[in-house]
Swiss-Prot record:
Catalytic EC class: transferase
Name under which the protein is recorded: tRNA (guanine-N(1)-)-methyltransferase
Family named by the database record: Belongs to the RNA methyltransferase TrmD family.
Gene Ontology biological process terms, A to Z: tRNA N1-guanine methylation
InterPro entries membership: Alpha/beta_knot_MTases (IPR029028), tRNA_m1G_MeTrfase_C_sf (IPR023148), tRNA_m1G_MeTrfase_TrmD (IPR002649), tRNA_m1G_MTases_N (IPR029026), tRNA_MeTrfase_TRMD/TRM10 (IPR016009)
Main localization category: cytoplasm
Entry GO CC: cytosol
Enzyme Commission code(s) on record: 2.1.1.228
Alphabetized UniProt keyword annotations: Cytoplasm, Methyltransferase, S-adenosyl-L-methionine, Transferase, tRNA processing
Binding residue positions for S-adenosyl-L-methionine: G112, I132, G133, D134, Y135, V136, L137
Description of how the protein assembles with itself and partners: Homodimer.
Coiled coil segments of this chain: none
Location(s) in or outside the cell: Cytoplasm
Length: 225
């Protein structure tokens, strides 16, 4: 898989992709992450990527020209499954969406900034608009990092223990069951006996029960679908 991220602040996320699972995925050749500085696609001496909005609205708007140049340059080299725009008013990102996007070969993620992008970009070049939550960030860079991480980590081979990824919260619309490690008794705080029993079937039953109980308590909306 290849993910191309277009941003006005590449330094905000470069370090994120050079450590932990994201670095491992790239070292294994299972994922490529390419970060593109939108200012490299400007043609004026000030390398401006924003301008004042028509209508006298507050804030600044990302310009069409550099964004189109960057996207077109990438599309000239390969086909893309989706051109994604990170925006608070997009479709809510969730685990099923991450699962679906992990099957793609090539993705572009355009990070929003300032007041937003010229809407014509959204009308003519963007294929999918995604939000990671009902709140506003300084820019879409953190949202792009969140999405890339969720997508890449479930590519087969990225995580050594694939069952670990498959049992994460939200994979089956349930929150994950509690997990414990040694010591089994710490200051009287004990691990549930069932987990020490070695009885695989009963442990699985306990795991499902815990997942259901936690979901009912913390995220009952997940059980409404």
């Amino acid at each position: 898989m290849r993910i191309d991220i277009i941003t006005v602040l590449p330094e905000m996320i470069e370090g994120f992709f050079n450590c932990s699972i994201m670095k491992r995925a790239q070292n294994k050749g299972l994922a490529e992450i390419h970060i593109h500085n939108l200012r490299d696609y400007t043609e004026d001496k000030y390398r401006r990527v924003d301008d004042y909005p028509f209508g006298g609205f507050a804030g600044m708007v990302m310009k069409i020209e550099p964004i189109e140049r960057c996207i077109n340059a990438l599309k000239a080299e390969r086909d893309y499954d989706e051109v994604i725009f990170t925006t608070p008013d997009g479709e809510q990102f969730n685990q099923p969406m991450a699962n679906s996007l992990s099957l793609a070969q090539n993705l572009i993620i355009l990070c929003g900034h300032f007041k937003g992008i010229d809407y014509r970009i959204r009308e003519h070049l963007i294929t999918k608009e995604i939000s990671i939550g009902d709140y506003v960030l300084t820019g879409g860079e953190l949202a792009a990092a969140v999405m890339a991480d969720a997508i890449v980590r479930i590519i087969p081979g990225v995580i050594s223990d694939e069952q670990s990824a498959l049992s994460d919260s939200f994979q089956d619309n349930l929150l994950a069951a509690p997990v414990y490690t040694r010591p089994a008794d710490y200051k009287g705080w004990k691990v549930p006996d069932i987990l020490l029993s070695g009885h695989e079937a009963k442990i699985k039953e306990w795991e499902l029960q815990q997942s259901l109980e936690r979901t009912k308590k913390l995220r009952p909306d997940l059980l409404e679908d």
